[in-house]
UniProtKB/Swiss-Prot annotation:
Annotated beta-alanine binding sites: 61
Organism ancestry: Bacteria, Pseudomonadati, Planctomycetota, Planctomycetia, Pirellulales
Protein name: Pantothenate synthetase
Residues where ATP binds: 30-37, 150-153, 179, 187-190
Functional pathway: Cofactor biosynthesis; (R)-pantothenate biosynthesis; (R)-pantothenate from (R)-pantoate and beta-alanine: step 1/1
Location of this chain's protein in the cell: Cytoplasm
Name of encoding gene: panC
Amino acid sequence: METFTSIDAMRAWCREKSRGGNTIGLVPTMGALHEGHLSLVHAAKKDCDHCVTSIFVNPTQFAANEDLDQYPRPIEDDLAMLRDAGVEAVFMPTADEMYPGGPQTHATSVHPSAVAFPLEGVHRPEHFVGVATVVMKLFQAAPSDRAFFGRKDLQQLCVIEHMVRDLNLPIEIVPCDIVREPDGLAMSSRNRYLSDDQRQRALCISKSLNQVEQAFLEGNHDPKQLESIMADHLSPCDSVDYAVVVDRQTLLPISEITQNAVALVAVRVGVTRLIDNRELIVA
């Protein structure tokens, strides 16, 4: 497995590997890897001839009051996991490599479509500008045929899909299913922040989504009633940023589920912010 910190070297590797029509799959991460990330790697290896993973904790997607400095960076463990998974190349740039002159002086950015405005966009106003910008940069640094993203960060997935569509980027976005712990908690790098008590309380998130999905499958297509069901099950959380049922494509509120929708949750358990979702597919 090769590791690169230089954009030029990473780009050259991708160009060399793509000769003869070979395909490259990119798995962008911020490190602190778990089985959810590895599921993306496995999908990339299955679908493409070559697989490259990036590890970069992007400073521009963290607000001043968020956990950039505390974000876990177990780089040796991450590299061992990727090596065992059969990744061929890992791109690990510094912030200076990605943002010459520093992130604070970086004047050019990607402003995403309206799908970024609700939900996370309300609670983390600059977050998706940072996400869209760094993903665009990663697409340039590691030119690939497909990029693999998890559905757990569903709004992020929508933002990136819209960016690729609207800017005619020559890359296919491949959504991959949420990977869960045996007890139902969605895998997240932030789960390691939870105490044993908080970990148990966090199980209410997936349980609330299970209840919403069950009610939907039994014929309840009223978003407000489904949101009430979610709220009733989220009381073990310390706070709830949102627990909503919205249109799957626009992420905007709806009065009735007549086409595919999604239930999305963002909560805090202790000081740890956790998100999850469940798609509600109209038969």
